[in-house]
UniProtKB/Swiss-Prot annotation:
Spans annotated as Regulatory domain: 396-520
Annotated localization: Cytoplasm
Protein name: 2-isopropylmalate synthase
GO cellular component terms attached to this protein's record: cytosol
Pathway named in the protein's UniProt entry: Amino-acid biosynthesis; L-leucine biosynthesis; L-leucine from 3-methyl-2-oxobutanoate: step 1/4
Catalytic activity: 3-methyl-2-oxobutanoate + acetyl-CoA + H2O = (2S)-2-isopropylmalate + CoA + H(+)
Main location: cytoplasm
GO molecular function: 2-isopropylmalate synthase activity; acetyl-CoA C-acetyltransferase activity; manganese ion binding
Function: Catalyzes the condensation of the acetyl group of acetyl-CoA with 3-methyl-2-oxobutanoate (2-ketoisovalerate) to form 3-carboxy-3-hydroxy-4-methylpentanoate (2-isopropylmalate).
Gene (UniProt): leuA
Pfam families (alphabetical): HCS_D2 (PF22617), HMGL-like (PF00682), LeuA_dimer (PF08502)
Ranges for domain Pyruvate carboxyltransferase: 12-274
Family: Belongs to the alpha-IPM synthase/homocitrate synthase family. LeuA type 1 subfamily.
Stretches that traverse the bilayer: none
Length: 520
């Protein structure tokens, strides 16, 4: 294997550690089969290196790498090992069937870790690094060494550790910000100085592994790239211990969107980002927050009227990347109390409603009133408002009372007729809906034969509404109606009136389905 790699290459290697460091996030453990499913997605995404686990820690991790090794032939598959002979030997055995194996060994280097965790001197750390990197190279040509807690390590000692690891045969040097402590300026300088000063640095790849404890994982990783890093270790959705790791979707899109600035690319197939993110969410049961960059539900959603108006003119006014480039179908114009009339009118037009100026004004007033009752307004809500407006031209539901006692149900409905008069009727039926429809038929004089009837929920959470859909016949002609309300019985009444009022309007025009009107 040729390990002479130029750090001047314009390609950044994406080392995904979702299946190792990411899985260490509380509650995110995966079975070997789940890891294989995720690894397939990472392969399709174009990840260069997949860290599969920590074979010395469990049989499950050993089984997972074996399963991946039998199936995945393109990406490099890495496993993690402590600087212990037994760990390295176990890892080497786990990699025997892997087409492109990498053995990743690590040892803490900071004074805090040396004193309290390892109880080792500088000299002992250097000796261990040399011995175990050499041992690893005896098994695998591709060896990565990580100086754990590198960003809190004295820089002169970190340079010495790096020199020893390179001399022992490491092909990748990883400098982790293990506890998310550093800043972009600091990590940029650290990489730049080490790459410039360590003998043999031009023969290896330098790698960044940043945690997000201060919310700087992506920023620090980008700064490390500016300092000369040519591998970034990251996870899907940024999952990982404590506050997580550098998020793959964020760093790859930062490099793509700001390509002219960074002048470096990755092999990531970005239109697969969202589906990969959603797969991980399902596998580990950890959803991302709605405002999560790139993959959150609000990443390409716009509610503000000013922003929506700008988006309608030119999407570049408020979006720096296309949703399609990361796997979303399109941008979302979220309708809520901040939305303007132009966005509401556009959405109504998309739903098939062509309104006059006065009608748009009235609908927008009704829309604003609805926004005071719920956070978001869906397409179903807009359609319900349009139905309400339509119903106002005919019979409107004023009130209803339903009682279901014994084998028969009773319904009392009160309607406002087209002239504004009140009409009240009662009926009995084989259940609440049957009684309701009977009372409505008596009140309107419209007889409908019910073919099918169903209700389902529309909307989200507390804003959910019941939608009733029915198919009926009148004079042998089939009609369909829908109604939406917080109450499913009321929604059923509105669906029935939707059809009845349509028939009455057709009667006024003198024709129903090609026949002279006779609604009775």
């Amino acid at each position: 294997m040729n390990t002479t790699i130029s750090n001047q290459t314009p390609h950044i290697r994406i080392f995904d550690t979702t299946l190792r460091d990411g899985e260490q996030s509380p509650g995110c453990s995966m079975t070997p089969q789940q890891k294989l499913v995720m690894a397939r997605a990472l392969d399709a995404l174009g990840v260069d290196i997949i860290e599969t686990g920590f074979p010395a820690s469990s049989h499950s991790d050993r089984e997972a790498v074996a399963m991946m090794g039998r199936e995945l032939r393109r990406p490099t598959l890495a496993v993690l090992s402590r600087c212990l002979q037994a760990d390295i030997e176990t890892s080497a055995r786990a990699l025997e069937t892997v087409a492109n194996p990498r053995l990743h060994v690590f040892l803490s280097t900071s004074p805090l870790h040396r004193e309290h965790k390892l109880r080792m001197s500088r000299e002992q750390v250097l000796e261990s690094v040399h011995r175990h990197v050499t041992l690893a190279r005896g098994y695998i040509d591709d060896v990565e060494f990580s100086a754990e807690d590198a960003t809190r390590t004295e820089e002169d000692f970190l340079a010495e550790v790096t020199r020893v690891a390179v001399a022992a045969g490491a092909t990748t040097i990883n400098l982790p910000d293990t506890v998310g402590f550093t800043t972009p300026e600091e990590i940029r300088g650290m990489f730049s100085r080490l790459i410039a000063s360590v003998e043999g640095a031009d023969k290896v790849i330098f790698s960044a592994h940043c945690h997000n404890d201060l919310g700087l994982a992506v920023a620090n990783s980008l700064a490390a790239i500016e300092g000369g890093a040519r591998q970034v270790e990251c996870t899907i959705n940024g999952i990982g211990e404590r506050a997580g790791n550098c998020a793959l979707e964020e760093i790859t899109m930062a490099l793509k969107v700001r390509g002219a600035f960074y002048n470096i690319d990755s092999a990531i197939n970005t239109p697969r980002i969202v589906s990969t993110s959603q797969l991980l969410q399902r596998l580990v049961g950890m959803p991302v927050q709605r405002n999560k960059a790139v993959v959150g539900g609000n990443a390409f959603a716009h509610e503000s009227g000013i922003h929506q108006h700008g988006m309608l003119r030119h999407r570049g006014t408020y979006e720096i990347m296309r949703p399609e480039d990361v796997g979303w179908e399109s941008s979302q114009m979220v309708l809520g109390r901040h939305s303007g009339r132009a966005a509401v009118e556009r959405r109504l037009r998309a739903l098939g409603y062509l309104l006059e100026e006065e009608e748009v004004k009235l609908m927008f007033e009704q829309f604003k009133a609805l926004c005071e009752k719920q956070r978001l307004v869906t397409d179903a809500d807009l359609q319900a408002l349009m139905q309400d407006a339509t119903v106002q031209e005919g019979y409107r539901l004023a009130s209803m009372t339903i009682s279901d006692v014994g084998s028969r149900a009773n319904a009392l409905v009160e309607l406002s007729d087209p002239e504004g008069n009140r009409v009240a009727e009662t009926a009995q039926g084989n259940g609440p809906v049957d009684a309701l429809f009977g009372a409505l038929a008596s009140a309107t004089g419209v007889k409908l034969e019910l073919d099918s009837y169903q209700v389902h929920s529309v909307g989200i959470g507390a804003d959910a509404r019941g939608e009733a859909s029915l198919s009926v016949r009148h004079d042998g002609v089939e009609y369909e109606g829908t109604g939406t309300s917080k109450d499913i019985i009321e929604a059923s009444a509105l669906a029935w009136l939707d059809v009845a009022n349509r028939l009455l309007r057709q009667r006024e025009r003198g024709v129903i389905a090609g026949k002279t009107a006779a609604v009775a």
